[in-house]
């Protein structure tokens, strides 16, 4: 019996990663009130769906403009696809669409290969991550202080303040 160097027990047997192709891209918007979180959904010919978040107010419409560059492509080819998408601007608010697509590609690649997508990004480096609390600016210093104090009482050790100079 031939000895294999690759343990295939963890692979998704319903997926053939080398023949995986993106067939559609859609946006689902989650949220309520003034808060909206566009989620990119990449669909494949093998029934896998990859999800990625369009970050902090970036344009979901811009993300959809990238669709034509993705259809028919193998989502496991994350780096090449990411580089082709960043030709059209990667910084600022437009970059959020590209970042969301990259997340969805990594999600698909991880599902296709049967591994968590963090393994595709270099592996696990820690067991826990500390979160910070963003705090929008308030014109009244006392009100700002109370907001920060409330976040500290809630258990946050790291605080971010959106302040400006006027």
Q: Locations of the language-model features?
A:
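N-terminal small/glycine-rich loop or linker at the start of catalytic domains
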Residues: 46, 113-137, 165
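N-terminal secretory signal peptides and thylakoid transit peptides that target proteins
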Residues: 1-4
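Structured beta-strand/loop patches that form or line metal/cofactor-binding pockets in enzymes
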Residues: 6-51, 55
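Metal-dependent enolase-superfamily TIM-barrel catalytic cores that perform enediolate-based chemistry
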Residues: 128-166
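Metal- or metallocofactor-binding catalytic centers and their adjacent structured scaffolds
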Residues: 45-115
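Solvent-exposed alpha-helices and their adjacent loops that cap or buttress functional pockets
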Residues: 15, 32-33, 123-125, 152-153
């Amino acid at each position: 019996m031939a000895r294999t160097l690759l343990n295939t027990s963890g692979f998704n047997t319903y997926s053939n990663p080398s023949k995986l192709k993106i067939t559609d891209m859609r946006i689902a918007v989650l949220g309520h009130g003034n808060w909206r979180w566009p989620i990119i959904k990449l669909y494949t010919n093998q029934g896998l769906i990859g999800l990625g978040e369009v970050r902090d107010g970036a344009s979901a419409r811009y993300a959809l403009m990238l669709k034509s560059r993705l259809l028919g492509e193998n989502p496991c080819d994350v780096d090449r696809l990411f580089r082709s998408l960043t030709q059209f601007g990667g910084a600022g608010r437009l970059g959020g669409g590209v970042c969301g697509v990259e997340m969805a590609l990594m999600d698909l690649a991880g599902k296709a290969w049967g591994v968590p997508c963090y393994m595709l990004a270099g592996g696990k480096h820690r067991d826990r991550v500390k979160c910070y609390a963003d705090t929008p600016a308030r014109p009244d210093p006392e009100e700002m202080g109370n907001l920060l104090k409330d976040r500290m009482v809630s258990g946050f050790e790291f605080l971010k303040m959106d302040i400006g100079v006027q």
